[in-house]
Amino acid sequence: MKLDGKTIYAQSSDIKSRTYLEYRKDMKKKAIAEVEVIDWLRDKIKELYPNKHIKVYKSGGDKFLWFLRKGGITREPDFIAEIDDEKIEFEFQYAEKENLDFYDFKVSKVVKKKNKKVIPTEGKLFIYIHKPSLKYAIFKPNWILKNAKYGMVEAWRSYAYRVPKEKFEKLLKPDPTLKNLCKNIDVKNFVLNFQHSLIDINKEKLSYLFQSVVDENKIVKIIPKDLDSFFKICFILDNLNKIPKNANLWLVYLLSYINKNISLENISKIVYCIDFLYSKIELKSNELIQLVSKSKELMETINAYYQKDGSYRSSLTISPLEETRHALFSINILEDLIQDMIFYYSKNYPDILSEVKPIKKIYENIKNIEKTYEFIKRGCKL
């Protein structure tokens, strides 16, 4: 991946203990909130700027990405608001916990250096939502600079501007419309955690493979002969941080396992392997065409297994709860894949990706997320 000046890249120590999927899960928590909040933010900006033409969007527009292949965070603002002919950047933060002693803000978001002086960033506002109290605040970087202390944030392992609780919470305003917004965020984070637990389940099932002696040089060369072997080998290589030889060929071969009658469990194995291989290679046009087509086919097959109670079912031998986990895991990866292809390949292959719809909200491909959420909650209590 080509490096760019607007990205702060993670140190290897930040992500080496996590697989790529685990890193993306962590990145997706804030992304869920960001894409859910856009409509609400637009309404708030309209209140601030009445009788103005307002347009609000994520940085990058339809091509925005909630994770980077090599780790790290972008320097781009979270949102851009076009207010008539003026553009204002918005940085978004939210608190999930009560009784915080400090509210922390990254230095690079608050100030910039000019003529060796530190000055507050212009043309930018902060939007902060305090979920426990259903309150929010909109303020300028200059307010942070005036009210914050400069100190170490252990969780970030870096220095930041820290606004004491007693000062910050005076800014917060109640808003009853935050109730539904925060509920939607909580539901999607619940689904995120539920589907991702499939990784831990598979680690437990396949732990015996990690305990045996593995010839790493041999395992990266041989193309597996069936889907189950494909999944096991990709899972091992992913956790060993190894890349197979001829990974492009592996991907094409893997896509041949996709058919209309495939079970949800096997779909989850396929999308895991696709995701693992895809992140390690550069696709040629014919491979991209196949992947776009097969991704669409997989999503349609998953949707066909949706039930009226919010579950997904394709088998009589696997519990509906576990089948639903497989379905949600697959939807999660396929949405990532769709957005990644748009982000990285639409410039060079616009014709191939012209019919691919960008992901507007995370988990938008779950037919009725409220029903699915309630089904999972009931199933987890049994």
Predicted regions and their residues:
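An alpha-helical repeat/solenoid feature that recognizes helix-turn-helix modules
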Residues: 188, 220-245, 259-289, 313-340, ...
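Acidic surface patches and DE-rich sequence motifs
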Residues: 83, 130, 215, 259, ...
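Buried hydrophobic core positions in alpha-solenoid tandem helical repeats
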Residues: 195-198, 202, 206-210, 250-255, ...
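HEAT/HEAT-like alpha-solenoid repeats
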Residues: 255-260, 300-313
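Short sequence/structural elements of tandem HEAT/ARM alpha-solenoid repeats
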Residues: 244-252, 286-297, 340-347
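Hydrophobic residues embedded in beta-strands of well-ordered beta-sheets
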Residues: 87, 134-137, 218-220, 310-312
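Nucleic-acid endonuclease domains
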Residues: 1-196
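Class I S-adenosyl-L-methionine
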Residues: 39-42, 234, 303, 377
